[in-house]
């Protein structure tokens, strides 16, 4: 049996499930409220305590969001990410962020297809939506946590994907959200 390869100093059995659930939560938080099932819990406190050492209160974040009510969530989401005379005030889709960079959506779809991630027809029109990108990252973490071999391929895929499709534009997204809705 060959040696197992993995990213140095990463205990996959501990970190992959936490990363997996965290990406799933952020995907749900950034999805359009019009697409979410109302009343579905965003997270349970059982696993969110595991990320407290990193200074993140995910249970509080999920509870605060759920406490705002669906109508308010839908109105605020639409005003920030969907409605605008010349497009949305803040682009939550990667291709909108990089209008001068062709092929973003195609590259995303190639990633999805290579790893067997299938978008339902409902979301196929927006493979570059931030919630879909986060859900795919959740999918890669899940595959890493459940893999018996080739763990490194999922870890490196996460690194490559996050570098290409999250790190490069989410800081700009955060700045634009803060400018449009200070303190949100």
Predicted regions and their residues:
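Surface/interface-facing alpha-helical segments and adjacent flexible terminal/loop regions used
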Residues: 1-184
């Amino acid at each position: 049996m060959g040696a197992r390869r993995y990213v140095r100093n990463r205990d996959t059995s501990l970190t992959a499930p936490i990363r997996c659930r965290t990406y799933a939560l952020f995907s749900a938080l950034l999805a359009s409220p019009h697409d979410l099932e109302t009343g579905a819990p965003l997270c349970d406190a059982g696993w969110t305590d595991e990320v407290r050492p990193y200074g993140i209160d995910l249970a509080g974040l999920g509870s605060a969001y759920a406490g705002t009510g669906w109508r308010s969530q839908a109105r605020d989401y639409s005003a920030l990410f969907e409605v605008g005379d010349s497009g949305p005030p803040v682009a939550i889709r990667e291709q909108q962020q990089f209008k001068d960079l062709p092929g973003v959506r195609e590259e995303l779809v190639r990633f999805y297809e290579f790893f067997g991630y299938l978008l339902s027809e409902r979301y196929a029109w927006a493979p570059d939506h931030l919630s879909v990108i986060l859900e795919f990252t959740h999918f890669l973490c899940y595959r890493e946590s459940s893999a018996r071999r080739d763990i490194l391929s999922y870890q490196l895929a996460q690194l490559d994907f996050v570098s290409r499709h999250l790190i490069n534009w989410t800081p700009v997204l955060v700045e634009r959200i803060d400018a449009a809705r200070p303190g949100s």
